[in-house]
Every structure is written in C-alpha cells, then in structure tokens.
Amino acid sequence: MKRIWMYLSAYKKECVFAPLFKMLEALFELFVPLVVSAIIDTGIGNADKGYIVKMSLLLVTLAVIGLTCAITAQYFAAKAAVGCATGMRHHLFKHIQSLSFTEMDTIGTSTLITRMTSDINQVQNGVNLVLRLFLRSPFIVFGAMIMAFTIDIKAALVFVVAIPVLAVIVFGIMLSTRPLYKKVQAGLDKILGITRENLTGVRVVRAFNKQENEIREFKQANEQLNHLQKFVGKISGLMNPLTYVVVNISIIALIWIGAVRVNAGTLTQGQVVALYNYMSQILIELIKLANLIINITKALACAGRIENVFSIKSSMQNGSTTESTDTRAAAVEFKNVSLRYSGAGDESLTDISFTVKKGQTIGVIGGTGSGKSSLVNLIPRFYDVTKGEIYIDGVNVKDYRIEALREKVGIVLQKAQLFKGTIRDNIRWGKKDATDTEIMEALDIAQGREFVEKKDGKLDSFVDQGGKNLSGGQRQRLTIARAVVRKPDILILDDSASALDYATDAALRKSIREMKDAPTLFIVSQRAASLMHADRIIVLDDGNVAGIGTHEELLENCEVYQEIYYSQFRKEKEA
C-alpha cells in the first residue's frame, strides 16, 4: 500500500477531485427518491400536470448534473490510476535492470513478465475503482439510511438491521478470498512459465515429438488453476446472491411496514416509494462495494507480489573505480576463484587460478557442463565469485563501477541475440556513436561485410526481433561486430562461432589478432582447431582446471585435452 500511495502522491489533485465529484453525483442521486415521492403525492395525487412537468424537468436536471460529475470523476480517476501504473511499471523495470544475474535466475523471467504486465494492470484497475467508489458507495448507503429516517423512523429501522448483516457478508467473503487470490496469481505464473518455455523451444519440442508431453503438462497446470479459480469463484459468487436475499427480505419488510403505516395515515404512498428507492440504492451500492472489495483484494495481492520484487536487492555492490592506473598489471588474473550458483548444491568452478597478459589469446575448452561459460561470465561480473578474487588491470572487479568494467569488456554470448531495428542500430549497441566507417570495420573483422553489402538496404536493412530473418551464421557475425566495434580491452567469444565454417572461423581469429591495439582475447570453443594457435589454453573438467598450457604442452601431459583433441582428429591419433 505504501508504494501505491508513493506513486499516487504525484496525483494529489486527481485523488481529491475523483472521489469529490463522485460524492457530488451521489448527493444529487439521493434527492431523486424525494422528487419522485413529491410527483406521486402532489402531482399525481392532485392531478397537477404543471407540477409533474416541473418536477420531471428537475429529475432530468439532476440526471444531467450527476452524469457530468460522473464523467469528470472518471477522468480524474483514470488519470491517477494510469499515472500510478505507469510510474510503478517504469520503476519496476528500472529495478529489474539493477538486479544481478543471480537474482534474475532466482525470480525467473516469466514471473517478472507477469509482475510487469498483469499484476500492474490489476493494481491500476483497483486504484481506478477505489477512487471512484470507495467513498461514493458508503456515502450512498449511509446517506440513503439517513434520508429514510427523515421520512419515517420506524420504517427506517429495517435499514439499521439490514446494513450490518450485509457488512458481515461482504467483509467475511473478502477476508476468506484474499489469500486464495494469491494462489491464483501463482498458478497464472506457472501457466505463463510453461507457455514461455514451450514457445521458446518449440522447434526442439517438435523435433523430439514431445507435443503430447507438453500438452499433458500444460493441461495439468491449467486444470489445477481451473479448480482453484472455481473454488475462489464459488466463495466470491456467494456475495451477490446473499446480499440480494438480505436486501429483498428487507424490501418485503419495508413494503409490509409501509403498507400498514399508509393504512394508518402515517405515511403517504410517495414516501413508501421513496423508501423502496432508497433500499434499491443501498442494494446497488452494496453490490458495487462487494465487487470493489473483490477487486481491491486482487489488487492488494498483486501489489504484494510486486513489492516482493522491489524488496529484492542486488547482491552485487557497485564499486567506484573507473580506470586502472597500473599499466604493468596483468590484463586478467584469477586468484583461487570458486563459484556456486544460488540454489545449486555443487560448485560450478573450484579454486581456479591463472594470469593473462595484455594482448594474449586464451582458449577455454572442456566437456559439456565443465564451467567454460561460468568462467568467462565472471570477467564482466555477470556473477560474483563465491570465493577468491578476480583482477582486471590490477584492480579487483568488485572495485570497478559496473558500467566502467563492462565498457572494457566486449562479450559475444553463446546465443546470438539481436534486437528489432536496422543492422546499424544493432551494431551501435556496442558503441552508440559509432560511425558507418567504424561499423564497416567491425563487420570486416567479424567477416560480415560481404553479406551485409549484398542486402538491398545494407546497414539500413531491417532485423526482426531476435534476428529471425537472418541465418545463424549471420546473427553470430553481427553480434561479434557489435562487440568489436567499441574496441574493447578484453574480448570474449563464448562459443560464438559455432555456426561458422572453419575457414570463416580462422579468418575471424586472424582479423582479431591483426586489430590495432588487439584486445586480450578469450575464446570458448568445443573445437580444438579454433584454439590450437592460442597463447595458452585452459582445460576445464567438472569445474576444475585440468590443465593450462599451449596446444603442444597439453597434448603431451593433459589427458582431458588429449581426449577432446583426438576425438576430433582421429586420423592423427591413428598415425
């Protein structure tokens, strides 16, 4: 609630005017039964057509004024609700960007998408309804009861009995459904997660004929959500019929008492109609209030889930160093580094130590799950080490400002991720003010110039989201160009040439080595041929260093490297 008020504080005027105009509308509405009563008792009773016309015009005037107030209130409420949701969505997105990969992995992508979309939309709807109805409905209920007392005290006692009973029903159902709505939202998260995973891996699903398995898993989760929603719906569904029963019994009692008092000459027919209208107003407003409370319950549950994301703070503290002053320091140094991912049992990396000089090319090789990507992901500080220290240019990576550190490092990840826009726009992610000349130089290094120049739009050629309109090799070359255009001190190629043929891969490595002020290069690859000419090769095996050395040294004394190399060059082994 505090966070919602924080965002609404920028809309104080709207938060005052929205309920104010709604209460003005309610005030005019409370006079309608009195006007109708006057028409019946005076106009119809005395057959006074002029009076009837005059009072009918008054009814129309009250309706027009009420409508104007309602529209004005809706405008202010919508402005405040949309503004609140917009501010919350912006700050939530900004907060998500500040989280480290550890927190992102823990929360989950589908959960964050739900918080950003449906949860914030639910809060927006709740705020809108609260501003319009939270004061109006109680005002009508108690106002109608007071007006009833001004007409006849004994008949109005029916209201005194009915309203507390209705309040017990409404608030009892609200309290019982609130925790259930949290479970419903959790079920929706699960559905979204399954859907996202299926759509992301749809090609794999179909390649292995796993459609039926996916359908079965989705059906199970969907049915669980269905049963839960039905249960919540049954409880919430009791509200309207129970309130109708109480109100209808009250109306019957009111008409019976009214009839007795009309016969006694204490009440007029118009006054009985007015009492009936006030009871109807109470019924309508209590139903609105009941639905409002259900929506408030949903909104508060969603707001609590959003607050849970806001309460998660990044485990990665920002440093203050922007540049190293030690020109003699090693480019990269790992000292007894270990890494355990959050929630994982075993360490992904254990006691890793090595030193890399500036300008060296380092190969990283190992079996599947050996920790190759984990190792290079520590250099730009995507994750923090569990133990040990990492130094870049003699400065601990934790002491760098994260932005400054990542400016020094260019990384090409395993998955070639491009964004909707032109080729020029995508490469400028690496350097926002890169000229076309710099972009073409980067494409030359990445071996991508040829295919770009063949396109009609060249650098202005459009790239679909994710680069779906490009081949795997084209996507990889563009992501490499994006990394090298900034001319980083350290360049990491994390198995990012897997879609390239050997000739293109070799030309790429040659171009990088020939760059002016060539970067310190880390190449992660499954191909031994891609790493043979590296200054040193780090061989990983189940998170441990199995060997460090040149290709020739490792081929002599590292069994893990021998196994990898000879599995790819069998003829040489046989010879």
Annotated model-derived regions:
Residues 1-32, 36, 44-58, 73-77, ...:
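Membrane-integrated ABC transporters
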Residues 8, 92, 96, 205, ...:
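Helix-loop junctions and hydrophobic alpha-helical segments within the transmembrane domains
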Residues 9-13, 98-102, 118-131, 135, ...:
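An intracellular "coupling" helix at the cytosolic face of ABC transporter transmembrane type-1 domains
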Residues 10, 14-27, 62, 129-184, ...:
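Transmembrane helices of ABC transporter permease
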Residues 48-54, 147-161, 231-305, 309-310:
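Helix-loop-helix
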Residues 314-327:
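Pre-NBD coupling/linker segments of ABC/ABC-like ATPases
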Residues 325-575:
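ABC-type nucleotide-binding domain
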